[in-house]
């Protein structure tokens, strides 16, 4: 799989050196490239911090507390993944033009990406054994201090993986930064590809994105180094939810504020477009066809990516070999590239080595696998790391080999993380645009491509049915994800946990 992940980098390298080494270095060190790098890094840092704070807090509230309506909020807080960032950006910039620039781009991307942190962290909270927290409380620490000093350490791998995904999404996003008029690397790449026949500028900028993605991946690996779960009994159970008591109203305020920014405002904009579209004849047959095509592609991609991701996740979670680290790094680097770069690489290799599959769903699924494999690897690896090592040891002492132990013990315990990855892949594929536009079979339009086509010609009323259908498509996987997480969250009866006054 690392070979597929590295194919866009190979393509970029070939393009860069086609123009000569001197020309490539002159483009690399010009002021324009430096400005784009600084602006991209600033945006990425702001979005990463915002997603980390909002995602971890939201996951803790819906999995570890008695927040009223937490089951509904667990599903609702994943809904932003179904709303394309470029749709949310348009709604916000139309209503609040003053947000143009860094504030608007950061707001939209945090609102769109924090579920990438929340979902794996929620799965990690749900899978964690409460034994360590119980010991902390017997030593006199209250619930909040235990959550901050003990439970937070257990979700470091999941939080780091989710933050990495949010960061990579940020450096590869085009629609939101373009609509918010924030000049970042992706805008430079797209402008270079569109501006002429010489693709060297775009390739050089793409390679800089590779460097940034590599740095982010190595930083994430360092943050989660040594963060493994160690429990004694290996009994699968979850502690009684923490009573919020007088903190219920502040907790509700936080959750509702997040939902307002990430879901309510974009949805109100879509509803207004939908009302406007009623003046025209809506081609419901086209909407239904695009919906079915989207479901088919997203389902196929989710299955393929999970099948590829689970062995990678098991390997990198259980070993620290250079081969495993290199494979994981390659997988994450590809996720930081713009979809058009990956699409062009797949076209490049497809025409030369797999011409029979050009403009078929096969190459499209390959592109999805290259782009979105980290969405499944990260949560699955974090869930595997958080499972009890003692359980694996007991299984092996009873005669089970490593493969059988992984199949019968580790993977079932890691199911919430694997389900989180599958849901993330499904939701992200459903709204993927550049790669789908380039590689889809002729006439096979998805909800995202139809939505983009309508918004490109400012027909926002006609775009509304496709946007709302895209949100509808996301409901089922988010519900499945919520149930998978809650299967690991059924509380056992323990002594009530008191919150410090």
Describe the role of every protein-language-model region.
Residues 122-133, 143, 381-392:
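Membrane-helix/interface signature in polytopic inner-membrane proteins
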Residues 1-19, 29-126, 154-174, 202-221, ...:
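Membrane-water interface segments at the C-terminal ends of transmembrane alpha-helices
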Residues 26-27, 124-125, 149, 165, ...:
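Short alpha-helical segment immediately N-terminal to, or the first helix within
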Residues 218-255, 488, 492-498:
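Alpha-helical transmembrane segments of integral membrane proteins
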Residues 171-197, 431-460, 493-498:
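Glycine-rich helix-loop "coupling/hinge" segments at transmembrane-helix boundaries
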Residues 136-137, 395:
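The alpha-helix within a helix-turn-helix
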Residues 37, 140-141, 149-151:
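Polytopic alpha-helical membrane proteins, predominantly small-molecule transporters/carriers
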Residues 13-25, 180-186, 227-235, 271-275, ...:
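Peri-membrane helix termini and adjoining interfacial loops of integral membrane proteins
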């Amino acid at each position: 799989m690392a070979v597929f992940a590295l194919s866009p980098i190979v393509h970029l390298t070939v393009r860069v050196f086609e123009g000569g080494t001197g020309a490539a270095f002159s483009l690399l060190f010009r002021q324009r490239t430096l400005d784009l790098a600084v602006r991209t890094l600033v945006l990425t840092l702001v979005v990463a911090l915002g997603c980390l704070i909002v995602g971890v807090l939201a996951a803790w509230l819906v999995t570890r507390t008695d927040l009223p309506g937490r089951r509904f909020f667990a599903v609702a807080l994943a809904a932003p993944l179904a709303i394309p960032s470029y749709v949310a950006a348009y709604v916000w910039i139309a209503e609040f033009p003053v947000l143009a620039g860094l504030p608007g781009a950061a707001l939209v991307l945090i609102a769109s990406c924090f579920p990438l942190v929340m979902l794996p962290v929620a799965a990690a909270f749900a899978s964690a054994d409460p034994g360590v927290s119980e010991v902390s409380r017997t030593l006199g620490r209250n619930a909040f201090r235990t959550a901050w000093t003990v439970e937070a350490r257990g979700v470091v791998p999941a939080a780091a993986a989710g933050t990495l995904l949010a960061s990579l999404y940020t450096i590869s996003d085009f629609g939101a930064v373009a609509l918010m008029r924030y000049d970042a690397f992706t805008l430079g790449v797209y402008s270079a590809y569109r501006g002429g026949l010489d693709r060297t500028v775009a390739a050089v900028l793409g390679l800089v994105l590779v460097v940034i993605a590599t740095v982010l991946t190595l930083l994430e690996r360092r943050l989660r180094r040594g963060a493994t779960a160690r429990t004694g009994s290996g009994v699968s159970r979850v502690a009684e939810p923490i009573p919020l008591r007088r903190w219920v109203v502040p907790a509700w305020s936080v959750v509702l504020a997040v939902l307002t920014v990430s879901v309510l405002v974009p949805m109100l904009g879509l509803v207004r477009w939908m009302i406007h579209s009623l003046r025209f004849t809506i081609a419901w047959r086209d909407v239904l066809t695009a919906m079915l095509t989207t479901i088919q592609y997203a389902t196929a991609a989710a299955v393929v990516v999970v099948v590829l991701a689970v062995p990678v996740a098991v390997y990198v979670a259980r070993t620290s070999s250079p081969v495993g680290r290199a494979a994981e790094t390659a997988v994450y680097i590809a996720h930081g590239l713009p979809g058009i770069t990956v699409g062009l690489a797949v076209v490049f290799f497809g025409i030369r080595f797999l011409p029979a599959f050009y403009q078929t769903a096969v190459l499209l699924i390959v592109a999805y696998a290259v782009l979105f494999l980290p969405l499944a690897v990260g949560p699955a690896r974090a869930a595997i790391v958080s499972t009890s090592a003692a359980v694996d040891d007991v299984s092996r002492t009873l005669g089970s080999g490593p493969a059988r132990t992984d199949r019968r013990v580790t993977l079932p315990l890691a199911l919430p993380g694997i389900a989180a990855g599958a849901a993330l892949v499904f939701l992200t594929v459903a709204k993927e645009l550049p790669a789908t536009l380039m590689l889809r079979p002729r006439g096979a339009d998805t909800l995202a491509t139809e939505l983009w086509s309508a918004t490109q010609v400012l027909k926002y009323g006609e775009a509304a049915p496709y946007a709302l259908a895209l949100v509808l498509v996301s409901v089922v996987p988010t519900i499945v994800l919520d149930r998978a997480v809650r299967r690991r969250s059924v509380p056992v009866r323990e002594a009530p946990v008191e919150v410090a006054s």
